[in-house]
Amino acid sequence: MENVIQELRDREVGKVLEQEPLANHTTMKIGGPADILIIPNRVEAVKDIMDIVKKHDLPWTVIGRGSNLLVLDEGIRGVVIKLGAGLDHLEIDGDQVTVGGGYSVVRLATSMSKKGMSGLEFAAGIPGSIGGAVYMNAGAHGSDMSEILVKARILFEDGTIEWLTNEEMDFSYRTSVLQKKRPGVCLEAVLQLEQKEREAITAQMQQNKDYRKNTQPYSSPCAGSIFRNPLPDHAGNLVEKAGLKGHQIGGAKVSEMHGNFIVNAGGATAKDVLDLIEYVKKTIREQYDVDMHTEVEIIGGNR
């Protein structure tokens, strides 16, 4: 790996770290080490990184700001590319916004509200990056990324980079084409917003923030929603009805504030979280004959 690390540093692609604990890079504060973690300093650096990765036939993984993510205790082999400060550019052209995949969703929503640009009110309080939000079609309060995305610049598994339109992204509830049909990650996105009264936008965002603050445990280390909603029901409702709020395995605990959240109550391992997820699935299946499916992305180990 030393020659790979030196090559990456010689190309000045950004920060390069060895055996970096991914617990330092996830909102759940859980995760084993990455062999090599790279934080690119610009979009073009991603192409240089991929050239080196392919040259040495290394496995690679991309993460954002670490929300909606559970990294296994074994960590991740090969190269982990973290979209962060180097991919947080922002350009405004009329009502269209071009934003880097590493840009904070909350930061963008707040910034646009101050300019009287509407469309991101639903994102107030959503943790994570724009790249991750596009990848999973993040949403809340009756809206999601599919309603504002014009196109996205995607890095695919084979290392190629191209733009996909909204239609080509094949969005549905908390999914996109990037998850299975054409695995890839969003490096930057073009969003269509609209001008509205700044006071109205700010009021709606504050209402959404207050709702999250009062109903979801973001003051504790967590990944966000653990399960997809088994429509027409809600995952949190089923967990609560099953009496599972507060249930704990090791350091992982079902939040007492919201049933669809698992928090790191102290020293939790990924195994603790996985065991708790399976316990919740089994209990819900036995009590309500409903199969629960995870929304949180689980990566690392042999996955």
Swiss-Prot record:
Tell me where in this chain the FAD-binding PCMH-type domain is found. Answer: 29-196
For molecular function, the Gene Ontology terms on record are: FAD binding; UDP-N-acetylmuramate dehydrogenase activity
Q: Which GO terms describe its biological process?
A: cell division; cell wall organization; peptidoglycan biosynthetic process; regulation of cell shape
Q: Taxonomy-wise, where does this protein's organism fall, top ranks first?
A: Bacteria, Bacillati, Bacillota, Bacilli, Bacillales
Task: Return the broad EC class.
Answer: oxidoreductase
Q: What is this protein called?
A: UDP-N-acetylenolpyruvoylglucosamine reductase
Chief location: cytoplasm
Q: Does the keyword Hydrolase apply?
A: no
> InterPro entries from the xrefs?
FAD-bd_PCMH, FAD-bd_PCMH-like_sf, FAD-bd_PCMH_sub1, FAD-bd_PCMH_sub2, MurB, MurB_C, MurB_C_sf, Oxid_FAD_bind_N
Any idea where this protein resides?
A: Cytoplasm
Q: Which Pfam families match?
A: FAD_binding_4, MurB_C
Q: Which reaction does it catalyse?
A: UDP-N-acetyl-alpha-D-muramate + NADP(+) = UDP-N-acetyl-3-O-(1-carboxyvinyl)-alpha-D-glucosamine + NADPH + H(+)
Q: EC number(s) of the enzyme?
A: 1.3.1.98
Give the keywords, sorted. Cell cycle, Cell division, Cell shape, Cell wall biogenesis/degradation, Cytoplasm, FAD, Flavoprotein, NADP, Oxidoreductase, Peptidoglycan synthesis
The answer on whether this UniProt entry bears the keyword Repeat reads no
Function comment: Cell wall formation.
Catalytic machinery residues: R174, S225 (proton donor), E295
